[in-house]
């Protein structure tokens, strides 16, 4: 029988090999507990290493974002259904800061405030994630606004032009056409998109905050019908969403846009509207027990909007030359632009377009108040032909409004004042525009030139709309080269002479047709018994149509 021997060296070697190959699978996890919850807010105790804006996960899988970092607890805004969150539940850190997925696949899609698709068209492949709380480009990364962003709206492109990288506020009471102005601007980018030229193309983002779901659906329908959805992303946070989603939606849209801007592309983003975002932020702040300030808004409500709108910029050539143009919308009460939120946003932006209820009700649409609307930086980006023809337009309209108010009390006016009133009424009529019908820049230049130079003074006010549409049609058929020259930025004596000749020829046709309609109609038959004493005449007057007299 063999003798059993124990080798201590072998045992020691085996133990050393085992110890050296051993790795402890230990994971460290911070866990907190819900102290109280309600109204979409949870206060969590524990989790001492939590970062601001870090995502936290509750027991049922619901996500929340840490906004308040107090000594004893964390104030968390729940992003989702908070009905299942109860006191005592466990909460754990994710280590991820609030961010949104980005990429070209978002064009043509509708997403929520977290960048998740809600249009039923499946998942969206992303090119990465971008934090919602990103710093705006610094001073050295920017350059002056020098490229125009055409809205297709005559009154805006002529008097308050917008440049790529500008922040232009659209402000007014409810139901004054604010959203329509923004949508017209999106629709007007269609030809640029279809040109295929990256320098011309503008990607659009429409952020809907606190609107009815049916309204958002109708806006999507308008964009689809016009063929504009292919270059547009809708970030929707309807009225039914919790306040946290409404507060975050504009930042999500901005993050998607910044991804394209830093890629050297041009972006247009519409925030519709920031009044509702401020109200949602107020609700969240009060529930988090932050001290209220003016109108119960928290002290940092200015920073809420400034850090959002400062992301809109025109980047320098070294940074790729991309841009993000912002059109924030603010709703006023009784045309009061001196309220807290309107004055905040006016001071942040580069100009404002003020829409007035009285003008809207008078049929002046878009209802732009020329006196209070201004563009501080867009003038340097305005196309040269428009800059040359629209110089006196704002002054003419301002003088017209002043004279109009005076004429209401004055019984008689001198000839010059009457002429100014006549021209002003035609300019107002000329700047009217139907919904969702943006004008190409060359058409705008021709019409503004005709109005400012008095070429429409002998056209009846009621016929201005028909005259402009028929005249543009006439130019496209007979003088297409002139329109092409204007579109290319050419404006000089030769172009003016061609337009002079064209409008003179067309007015003969137009006014001749008017005379034919009015003068060559059969005389009215006299009533029975009045054959011997009634005379019916027909005549034409340049300014007005007078009734038949006896």
From Swiss-Prot:
What class does this enzyme belong to in the EC scheme? Answer: translocase
| UniProt keyword Chloroplast, yes or no | no
- The superkingdom of the source organism is Bacteria
GO terms of molecular function: ADP binding; ATP binding; proton-transporting ATP synthase activity, rotational mechanism
Subcellular localization, as worded in the UniProt entry: Cell membrane
**Binding residues annotated for ATP, in chain numbering:** 172-179
Record InterPro entries: ATP_synth_asu-like_sf, ATP_synth_asu_C, ATP_synth_asu_C_sf, ATP_synth_F1_a_nt-bd_dom, ATP_synth_F1_asu, ATPase_a/bsu_AS, ATPase_F1/V1/A1_a/bsu_N, ATPase_F1/V1/A1_a/bsu_N_sf
Which residues lie within the region annotated Disordered? 521-550
Compositionally biased tracts (Basic and acidic residues): 534-550
Q: How does it sit in the membrane?
A: Peripheral membrane protein
Q: What keywords were assigned to this record?
A: ATP synthesis, ATP-binding, Cell membrane, CF(1), Hydrogen ion transport, Ion transport, Membrane, Nucleotide-binding, Translocase, Transport
Recorded hits in PROSITE patterns, A to Z, give:
ATPASE_ALPHA_BETA
Homology family: Belongs to the ATPase alpha/beta chains family.
Q: What does this protein do?
A: Produces ATP from ADP in the presence of a proton gradient across the membrane. The alpha chain is a regulatory subunit.
In Swiss-Prot or TrEMBL terms, this protein is called: ATP synthase subunit alpha
Q: Which organism is it from?
A: Salinispora tropica (strain ATCC BAA-916 / DSM 44818 / JCM 13857 / NBRC 105044 / CNB-440)
Supply the source organism's classification. Answer: Bacteria, Bacillati, Actinomycetota, Actinomycetes, Micromonosporales
